[in-house]
Amino acid sequence: MYRYLAKALLPSRAGTAALGSAANHSAALLGRSRGQPAAASQPGLALAARRHYSELVADREDDPNFFKMVEGFFDRGASIVEDKLVKDLRTQESEEQKRNRVRGILRIIKPCNHVLSLCFPIRRDDGSWEVIEGYRAQHSQHRTPCKGGIRYSTDVSVDEVKALASLMTYKCAVVDVPFGGAKAGVKINPKNYTENELEKITRRFTMELAKKGFIGPGVDVPAPDMNTGEREMSWIADTYASTIGHYDINAHACVTGKPISQGGIHGRISATGRGVFHGIENFINEASYMSILGMTPGFRDKTFVVQGFGNVGLHSMRYLHRFGAKCIAVGESDGSIWNPDGIDPKELEDFRLQHGSILGFPKAKPYEGSILEVDCDILIPAATEKQLTKSNAPRVKAKIIAEGANGPTTPEADRIFQERNILVIPDLYLNAGGVTVSYFEWLKNLNHVSYGRLTFKYERDSNYHLLMSVQESLERKFGKHGGTIPIVPTADFQDSISGASEKDIVHSALAYTMERSARQIMHTAMKYNLGLDLRTAAYVNAIEKVFKVYSEAGVTFT
């Protein structure tokens, strides 16, 4: 059964084409412009009406500075929520003083607080020496520790880590994870190094971060990102615990995404992709949004395309495939494949593991065009930033763009998608599954016990005692004894009453987190008459939450 967010009957995707010419009339009916609170009596109209796209994102070029791009999205959200923040202040100040306070705190939130630039030497296996360059950016300490991944890529730059760190701050706020944002990058192509050399680089980078106070369970907690995984996180944890943290009982909480044997958590590897699935699920099951797009709710009979077959792309593909959607194309850096009859994720994964590439997969054809422009219902960019730009946005045929990557859409592309009534599910919400489960892993490390261990047997026994009590009551009622009225649970119920494993708890908590955050975004989009502009709604929610922390904690030495 599918949900209806709005009470009013909403127009179809074809019908929304007329909304552009009727926008002024709709605004007159509502008595306000885009960004102003919606009238409570018109929820459907608030969702359906497409408003003028804000001009606050200043970069109108096709390849904007990544950090400036994120700041522009922040400015757009801040301009919408500023009046509410002023109104909600409970201080004995004049209106002007309150506004100055709000604007001051917003200026505190926006910049990146710390950026560490590192260079260190390593000796390679052939005896040569090489200087490695790396960065760690901490965007905000409004909550500690800071949290953000470490990526290995030759494209790493100061601008990139600053932008990704700021996105992490807002991402954590959107899903109510109490961390500040951070990000790290090491400027290497890991394919050019042996495992021994990568271990040297990772351990030395960890030591450099530790010497500068940029890693620690209560200070800054890295995680996997592009070209890093459990192996690298295990090296980081071991290096920290064996050196700086050798007296700290919580030392292994200095990093998340570790193997289970090193304090990791079940479900972390697939967390980001699973979060992408749940994020899409929450909007594709919302009948009011699907009505605007001219789509039926649910995954059944939907087609999707994945750009990037890494951790996020693979697991997103798995879950969408499992729930009835059909993947018709997959793109990687070395080429793309296409099959209108569908691509099986397990078969493609096995092929890539064996051959090192998706190219040549026997059940699909090579695709020569842009993977982003394939005709489909859902497009999942799960590669790198700034993939959807002003130049290719007009040719995108998908009705839903689900941002599995960080910053895949430039402001100009975002504007074009708004004008075309394409639903963009933003990165700061959609790919927050990774940091959500990282939070669970961090808590597990601090508690020094796995989820469910203390209650697993008790809950299982309690459930069976309950069933036995019901059975005995029925037998007494009908005068039958000795198990003649057996209570037999269904297979699904049997799994549930057997007790929740750590993976069950993690999956359930992640699904709830994504659902609750989606509800908040939908509510904000309606409240401020944002239509399909979910990105601005997500930024508004993030800004409100971060602002509240600064406002109530106070600002030291000002």
From Swiss-Prot:
Entries under PANTHER family matching the protein: GLUTAMATE DEHYDROGENASE, GLUTAMATE DEHYDROGENASE 2, MITOCHONDRIAL
Q: What is its EC number?
A: 1.4.1.3
Q: Which family does it belong to?
A: Belongs to the Glu/Leu/Phe/Val dehydrogenases family.
Q: Name one GO molecular function term.
A: glutamate dehydrogenase (NAD+) activity
Please describe what this protein does.
Answer: Important for recycling the chief excitatory neurotransmitter, glutamate, during neurotransmission.
Lineage of the source organism?
Eukaryota, Metazoa, Chordata, Craniata, Vertebrata
Q: Which UniProt keywords apply?
A: ADP-ribosylation, Mitochondrion, NADP, Oxidoreductase, Transit peptide
* Gene3D superfamilies in alphabetical order: 1.10.287.140, Leucine Dehydrogenase, chain A, domain 1, NAD(P)-binding Rossmann-like Domain
InterPro entries tied to this protein: Aminoacid_DH-like_N_sf, Glu/Leu/Phe/Val/Trp_DH, Glu/Leu/Phe/Val/Trp_DH_C, Glu/Leu/Phe/Val/Trp_DH_dimer, Glu/Leu/Phe/Val_DH_AS, NAD(P)-bd_dom_sf, NAD_bind_Glu_DH
Task: Give the Pfam families listed for this entry.
Answer: ELFV_dehydrog (PF00208), ELFV_dehydrog_N (PF02812)
| Quaternary data | Homohexamer.
Q: Which gene encodes it?
A: GLUD2
Reactions catalysed according to its record: L-glutamate + NAD(+) + H2O = 2-oxoglutarate + NH4(+) + NADH + H(+); L-glutamate + NADP(+) + H2O = 2-oxoglutarate + NH4(+) + NADPH + H(+)
Q: What class of enzyme is it?
A: oxidoreductase
Residues annotated as binding substrate = K84
What are the record's GO terms for cellular component? mitochondrial matrix; mitochondrion
Q: Biological process GO terms, please?
A: glutamate catabolic process
Q: Cellular location of this protein?
A: Mitochondrion matrix
Record PTM text: Stoichiometry shows that ADP-ribosylation occurs in one subunit per catalytically active homohexamer.
- Residue positions of the active site: K183
Transit peptide (first-last residue):
1-53
Provide the protein name.
Glutamate dehydrogenase 2, mitochondrial
